[in-house]
A protein has these predicted regions:
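C-terminal His-loop and adjacent cap/lid subdomain of alpha/beta-hydrolase
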Residues: 18-123, 128-454
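Secretory targeting and sorting signals
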Residues: 1-17
């Protein structure tokens, strides 16, 4: 009889407690459709540990996914987790309007299939899906016990649109003032793709001169672009030229294309443009950037007048936001910081698509809401968007589980503790969690140079 009544308490007791009730269905992959038009996929492990991981995928194809990648899926199943995730229902690839509801609907469908109530459910979000999961942490609906965000877009769409506008405006206005490349209010995906291609061409050509490189570095500072994009170690702190080359590579290898084509999809979802730069003080933005020294050095070497460029940018900035689009994204695609369940966030220290500075802005929101005790953030010493090892992700999930077991964070999210847990999985990798304090989100709402209220 003990097995039949083992509920949430089972996971809190000693290891010899009754094992979790097993599902009504055999191990394997399952799929289904939701009323919203979304579909879902799930995996049941050989021996279920009682926990469901509700996975929220990133920006891109609206296809159901239930894990970050195949090796991580296999390890999670090996550890006994049941996995489920939805495709989201679109039509925009920026699916925040429907994603939270689609995720809960997928969870409900999976629970019906299992025929057993999970002892615990953890929302695990990646990139844009990290914003989905962070919103679930504020709206757990009695279903979600904890949240793990990975490379999460946790500063939300309003900030993303604003600081990316600062960056592309700087590139277009200083490098190609006569070209009139459209930066907001795209009429079609094709128009956005052409604008992205035009910006890539301008940046590629400008990289050939010291003046061009200095201005690309300035735009990169506004984009919160890391100075480390590829390789196992970053350029030396004073090697400003090498840092700039890494920023350039990130921009032309896909960064600019993602920023511009992604904006078109967000505009489609929001019904307009949420970004503004009219009234933004570009000198204050640069002064707040961790890369200000690099930019100033490259301007000096090029013999360029940085003050003049900053004055030009501030004077000519004239993009105003559409109030309806701002209201729409405020509702669907921003966080309040009002966490209702524990959350662990992990991020690489150098992320060219969702800068690690998102975590600084997010932590301030959570602190302002009085919920800092529920949030922990941990950082991986590597470059690239979502470039985590499977062991690093599983160790983070296990740390969150221990937080839910004990009710306390203690040192669970400390780098040394996470590294030891990851390496104990013996997956043939060495974990890279490191002490790190992210810089401010340059151009973020309420940061220097841009008002909190638009």
């Amino acid at each position: 009889g003990a097995v039949a009544v083992a509920g949430g308490a089972a996971s809190m007791t000693a290891a010899n407690a009754a094992p979790p009730v097993q599902p009504d269905v055999p191990p394997g992959e399952y799929r289904g459709d939701l009323a919203s038009g979304a579909d879902w996929m799930a995996h049941v492990p050989q021996e279920w540990n009682g926990t469901v991981v509700l996975f929220a995928h990133g920006f891109g194809q609206l296809a159901a996914q239930d894990a970050p990648d195949e090796p991580t899926r296999q390890e999670l199943l090996e550890q006994g987790y049941a996995l489920v995730g939805s495709s989201y229902s679109g039509p925009s690839l920026w699916a925040l309007e429907s994603a939270v509801d689609d995720q809960y609907a997928a969870l409900e469908a999976f629970e019906e299939l299992l025929g057993v109530e999970p002892e615990r459910t953890i929302a695990l979000g990646r990139s844009m899906g990290g914003l989905v999961s962070a919103r679930q942490a504020e709206d757990p609906r009695g279903e979600i016990d904890g949240v793990l965000t990975t490379c999460g877009l946790v500063a939300g769409a309003l900030n993303l649109n604003d600081y990316q506008l600062d960056g592309v405006y700087t590139l277009s206005h200083l490098l190609a003032p006569d070209q009139d490349i459209p930066l907001v209010r795209y009429e079609s995906p094709e128009q956005a793709a052409q604008a992205a291609a035009d910006l890539v061409a301008v940046v590629t050509e400008s990289q050939g001169t010291p003046e061009g490189r200095a201005r690309i570095a300035l735009a990169s500072a506004f984009l919160n672009m890391p100075t480390w994009y590829s390789g196992d170690v970053p350029p030396a702190p004073q090697d400003h030229q090498a840092q700039q080359v890494q920023q350039y590579e990130a921009l032309v290898a896909g960064g600019l294309e993602r920023y511009v084509t992604g904006r078109q999809q967000i505009e489609l979802a929001a019904g307009g443009n949420s970004a503004y730069n009219a009234g933004v003080d570009y000198r204050a933005l640069l002064d707040s950037s961790a890369h200000a020294d690099q930019v100033r050095a490259l301007y000096r070497e090029a013999g360029l007048d940085l003050d003049a460029d900053l004055a030009t940018l501030t004077r000519d900035a004239d993009v105003e936001a559409d109030p309806e689009a701002v209201a729409d994204l405020t509702r669907s695609s921003m966080v309040t910081g009002e966490l209702a369940v524990p959350e662990l966030a992990i991020h690489t220290v150098a992320d060219e698509l969702v800068p690690v500075e998102h975590e600084d802005w997010y932590a301030e929101q959570v602190a302002r809401a009085g919920e800092a005790g529920l949030l922990r953030q941990a950082y991986v010493d590597g470059a690239g968007h979502c470039e985590f090892q499977p062991a690093e992700q599983v160790a983070a999930l296990q740390a969150l589980e221990q937080r839910l077991d004990t009710g306390r964070w203690d040192d669970l999210a400390d780098p040394a503790r996470l590294n030891a847990a990851a390496d104990a999985l013996e997956l043939g990798t060495t974990a890279r969690f490191t002490p790190f304090d992210p810089a401010r989100l340059v151009g973020g709402l309420g940061e220097p140079g841009r008002d909190r209220d638009r």
